[in-house]
Amino acid sequence: MSSQNSALVSVIGRGFDGLDIASLATDLGATFAQLDDLGTTLDQILVTVPEGDVVLQGTGVMDFDAKAAAALGIPFVLISNAPQRTSDLALAHARSLGAEVVGAFTDVASVPGALAAIESVAPVMSAEVFQKQLLDQARAAGAHIVLPQGEDDRIIEAAGALMAGKVAKLTILGDEADVAKRAELLGVDLTGVDVIDHLNSPLAEEFAADFAELRKKKGVTLEQARETMKDVSYFATMMVHRGLADGMVSGAAHTTAHTIKPSFQIIKTAPGASVVSSIFLMVMRGRLWAFGDCAVNPNPTAEQLGEIAVVSAKTAAQFGIDPRVAMLSY
């Protein structure tokens, strides 16, 4: 959307009565919408905001309106009937929330001219903005993800939300009747989700044979492999290994070690990587940061630290970060 033809209009010291925000949108050649109609949370608004140039009538809650403008990456306009000092403080607060502030006006007539002076506005990174970016990226990829912890209500609720948003193809591991019952009790629609009972699936025997072959040098027998495949993390990892899923999301009810161990035994590390590591993606101060390694290697060697830095930078780049690496004190 264009910064010169989009804006979010909020008020202070007055209401929206007598302000023709819709006509302002028409003058700018933009779509008009009311923030209240788009949702009650920033993540809802980010999904439902109209495409292209848009003029939004805010809620009148200046704090929320400023956060919405920052998240959407559109200029923030304040229509004020308050004392100058109050307006100045409100604008300063809006800037502190990341909003690109155009100014405070007594009516909308001066807004188009003020917007013309704005060169460009980019969305300020926040948890909601990052979530939308991730969902958009996942939706474009159309990946098939296996969720091994089907007994966890959070997994069922997350699966329902992902299916409603058409984000990915999903497989849940668990007893089909139990998963269906939990979904019904939670009011979650799992239409389109594949549910595999890993304990009774014919895939279990195939996976056991493959695992026994992979681990035969470690002395793993077929009978031991069959027992191993009763573990949802191993079964799900074998699905990824065999190309039956593109990825696995685990850890809701298991430790990091329990989740990583099957991958290390079956899939191994990427070419050029000798050590397993992790990164944490965190939104702070309007930016997206990647921290690695905070979970796997408590006392890495100098060589391992260097390798972790390189691998972490490559992973960060996949999430839109232009990586500049800083080595923190260990």
Tell me what each language-model feature is:
Residues 1-14, 22, 26, 88-129:
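C-terminal lobe/tail of nucleotide-utilizing enzymes
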Residues 16-20, 84-90, 110-111, 155, ...:
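Short, charged/polar "capping" segments at the starts of alpha-helices
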